[in-house]
Amino acid sequence: MKPIKKSITYGHHTLTIETGEIAKQAHGAVMVSMDDTVVLVTVVGDKKTKPGQDFFPLTVDYQEKFYSAGRIPGSFFKREGRPSEKEILTSRLIDRPIRPLFPDGFYNEVQVIAMVLSSDAEIDADIPATIGASAALILSGIPFDGPIGAARVGYIDNEYVLNPTTTQLNKSQLNLVVAGTQKAVLMVESEANELSEDVMLGAVTYGHDQMQQVINMINELADETGVTAWDWQPAEKDHSLIEKITQLAEADLRDAFRLKQKSVRTEAISEIWQRVFTELKAGTEEGPSEQTIKEIGFALEAKIVRNSILDGESRIDGRGTRTVRPITIRHGVLPRTHGSALFTRGETQALVVTTLGTARDEQKIDALQGDYSERFMLHYNMPPFATGETGRVGSPKRREIGHGRLAKRALLAVLPPVEEFGYAMRVVSEVTESNGSSSMASVCGGCLALMDAGAPLKAHVAGIAMGLIKEGNRFAVLTDILGDEDHLGDMDFKVAGTEEGITALQMDIKIQGITKEIMQVALLQAKEGRLHILDIMKQSLPIARDSVSVHAPRIIKFKINPEKIRDVIGKGGAVIRALTEETGTTIDISDDGSVTIASISNEGGEQAKRRIENITADVEVGKIYEGTVLKLLDFGAIVSILPGKDGLLHISQIANERVESVADHLKEGQIIRVKVLEADDKGRLRLSMKAASTEAAATPENGEK
């Protein structure tokens, strides 16, 4: 195949897709460039299904190569290792809009790999990578109802910006990624600075309109390439078996879905299917496979739940479509933590803990474009017991990393600036029960735990998950969805924000045909639910604590002359090491002279501050100091009046009367008051006890130690 290349202007960038030159043994391969950011995306599919396979094994791996930015990895081995959080999140971003477009019953393994080969600091590779995945899938011939397009939308000076640069995003009130087909939006991921529902919906619509040129370009590329489609057909439906299973299970399933408690309902449904499987197998050696029964069973469960809701009946747990589950809140639940909250909504519960730290505790990130640190971290954990199951416990899975990032996005807009609250903040959400919307429970609990820790947030933030059931022209938007409603529904729509507006939005749609009107209904219904939750949160904890926990570090910030930094650090770090050990503090000094002292006790912090001020203080001629006699000489004594500031007390300046022997009046280690008479060009000091005795003793502010 000869190389084929297509280019368009996309926003203020040139978007190019090439195929036919690199990775020709992959089933589909494209090089996508957006200005100087270049991504190679490949697709390979297995033409045979593994025996007993009952799910679609799609894998998406996004990889950032350090050479793409002209860097060598900072690890010991000097090569790329386990995927970073950014790589995992981008892999999920690509996966979410393409997964719904594979046909039902397609269980062949498919792997998408996106490798960043060249990285422009101003252009994130996630949009080119998503576009590349769409193009490579179309070229592969694998059954896929695409192509899709993707766009990033910013909001600057009340105008939408298509594919803003990194610099533009720094002043944008919105960072939204949208992906979809020619007809429908499939995925939205965003963080915002308390924007209205209308602005957010407008951004989604704007991005979807703009991406149509990308979809057209991919279609043109496929036409020129001459794609050979796979010879795959879905399995024929066994209508007699479907009818038989429906007769055996439908009535009992309807009764089971009226059970409000998740564990009881799950057990009842499991028993129904075990009975059905046994009856279908009775008297036959072959009979239908368990996989076939599961597929028919899922469709039957979906039909029962969906039709019940569309017919105006109560939801699974007896609620109406707009009702939020009962909420209970406790804060300050853990005595030794810096802040904690227990947020329970129905059968979903999150125990959220905040820990405050210093600049040294900030997360150091080795990214493509250089190292940087983040003062706010949010980690989400969901152990298997949260759903009444057994399972692996260990490093976080992709889902946990994605949910943590969503909750973090929701809270970023209300965090206090570092000048106002100088702590590093780590929030950990331990999901102890899960029946839908655990990430949004983490948002609510995270907000309360931060306020319990004394973080002065700009406003309360609450999150809520919305669902959708759509059949033809009939649809129902569901507030605060359950796990089963998420599983059997058509949309998972998570919205977080304050009373003023939205701070984070995530939408995943499983079907095509979601209109702007439906999204508008969902957003307005989500606002109604969000405000309800915010009212309950405010009643529980109206404002942040006045002070941080007694177990949290105390932070003192001040500035010194940058030229004096070396005096505080000392030779080989000796001075600052002694300061931290003797005062029990942690001391950080920036190049601009900013000093941050963290200590468990106020006394230790103030002592460290006082000693640093003494070290960096300039000696003033005519001022009286308390000094320590360091050494006796025949003609006087060497006296230290400030750390590193020694002067000569001549024998004639010790007393008004004649002094025959210095030792008769002074001894080493003695504390005396002296006045600075003179400081020469070389910094040598001439001191006097006689002059000091005629004036008032120095106060602590005047240098007393």
Curated annotation (Swiss-Prot):
Keywords per UniProt: Cytoplasm, Magnesium, Metal-binding, Nucleotidyltransferase, RNA-binding, Transferase
Organism in which the protein naturally occurs: Nitrosomonas eutropha (strain DSM 101675 / C91 / Nm57)
E.C. number: 2.7.7.8
Protein name as annotated: Polyribonucleotide nucleotidyltransferase
S1 motif domain mapped to chain residues: 622-690
Superkingdom field: Bacteria
Gene3D superfamilies recorded: GHMP Kinase, N-terminal domain (3.30.230.70), K Homology domain, type 1 (3.30.1370.10), Nucleic acid-binding proteins (2.40.50.140)
Main localization (coarse): cytoplasm
